[in-house]
């Protein structure tokens, strides 16, 4: 493992007991602050334009130096319980800046206030919105981290169920795909994960 990776893991491990003890409200606030910081880091490189849906909000994050056509539909992480539009914009700003392509990020509705299938419904509405904007499925890339990584797979299954054309590709960043917590990896990596515990998941 490279030195910088070891440093990151050690820092995350330090915060692990604190994160596990945070309330939902505190976790949400912390994630929002992280998003604001990420957006600030890229403020000279991107333009941000909010977009309102009936039940949720989204935003366009556009690189000033656009190098590619198409769009990334980014679904944020947060265990389906955390992640506001500010957090989504932060991660989207990083994607837009690094990839040189437009990113659309919905702040899908969260549990426990809005249980399943609210998040999936909002993800589907966001995909349909991009189609209405004139993007072809072959021009749309789905990306998501953690819970958002799992949600992009759920969205593709829903599109397949509806007989809709699938996007050109998927980028799952540490996707959460086992909501039952019954996989061997939960037990085998219990002490290895630098920031999460099975109980927190």
Language-model features: locations:
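A glycine/proline-hinged amphipathic helix-loop "lid/cap" segment
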Residues: 1-66
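Alpha/beta-hydrolase superfamily serine-hydrolase fold, recognizing
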Residues: 47-201
């Amino acid at each position: 493992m490279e030195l910088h990776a070891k440093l990151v893991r050690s820092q995350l491990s330090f915060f692990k007991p604190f994160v596990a003890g945070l309330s939902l409200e505190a976790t949400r606030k912390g994630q929002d602050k992280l998003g604001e910081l990420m957006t600030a880091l890229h403020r000279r490189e991107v333009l941000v334009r909010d977009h309102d849906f009936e039940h949720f909000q989204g935003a366009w994050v556009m690189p000033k130096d656009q190098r590619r056509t198409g769009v990334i539909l980014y679904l944020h992480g947060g265990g389906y319980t955390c992640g506001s539009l500010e957090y989504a914009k932060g991660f989207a700003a990083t994607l837009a800046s690094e990839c040189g392509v437009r990113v659309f990020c919905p702040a899908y509705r969260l549990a426990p206030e809005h249980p399943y299938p609210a998040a999936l419904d909002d993800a589907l509405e966001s995909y349909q919105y991009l189609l209405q904007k004139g993007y072809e499925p072959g021009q749309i890339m789905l990306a998501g981290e953690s819970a958002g990584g799992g949600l992009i797979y759920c969205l593709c299954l829903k599109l397949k169920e509806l007989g809709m054309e699938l996007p050109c590709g998927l980028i799952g960043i540490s996707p959460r795909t086992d909501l039952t917590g019954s996989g061997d990896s939960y037990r085998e990596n219990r002490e290895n994960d630098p920031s999460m515990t099975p109980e927190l998941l």
